Amino acid sequence: MQKQGLSHSSIKKAYEALNGFFRQYVVEQKIVFNPMVGVILPSKSQFNTKQLQVLSGDEMKKFVSVAAEKLKKGECRYRYGYGLIFVLYTGLREGEALALQYKHLDLKNRKVRIEQNLVMVTDGLGNKKRRPLIQRSVKTEAGVREIPLCDIALEAISNHIALYYTGNDEDYVFKTRTGTHLTPHNISKAVNQVFKRAKIDASGMHILRHSFASYLFAKGLEVKYISKILGHSSIQITYDTYVHTDFEQLKQIVTAI
């Protein structure tokens, strides 16, 4: 499995599932020996840590500039442009952003509350087409959190509200022109359009989150606070994810912003 490129966490989950399965079979006397006993789980150090892709300081500025572009008639070039800037400077997970409602925004106190998540599910009847479902929970217990808004995030969401808020706090911040849920595919397409126009070699929403985290590291914020803002279940996850980011890249971020 390691040779196939699977991550340590994926292999560990498979190992634990198989081990539990065969242990139960031994208990039920369906087999006499657990074949997983002789299987050695590779250590985490044996895996090559992937280099996270993050935007440089100049690229973050360029992203903001392009995402907020206006057409000749004054209309926004990108319907979700201000929303994407907001995500870039709050570090929200994709599902958290798509599940965000106006009631979760507290502009007076400069904060946003994260307490739910959007996932794509099937109907359970064999149809391949998936539909969006709002989970009244997030990825981890620590994921329920309040994130303070910096000036850029506050301005971006204020502009978004001025354009799209209709007075209903139950409405979702990210929704289509017809009022339906925006899907991960839709939002990924939107962010990639901004990347392309800005001539940034990047793809996907996750880069916005990684860039914000790296930006906070470069600014010298303590890891325990970064972990809390990101909604990680432990500080160790934050370390494991971001300590390998290239230092020169971090230095470029902090000097360019």
Model-predicted regions and their roles:
Residues 1-23, 27-33, 71-76, 181-186, ...:
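N-terminal core-binding DNA-recognition domain of tyrosine site-specific recombinases/integrases
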Residues 38-41, 99-159:
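Conserved tyrosine-mediated DNA breakage-rejoining catalytic core shared by Y-recombinases
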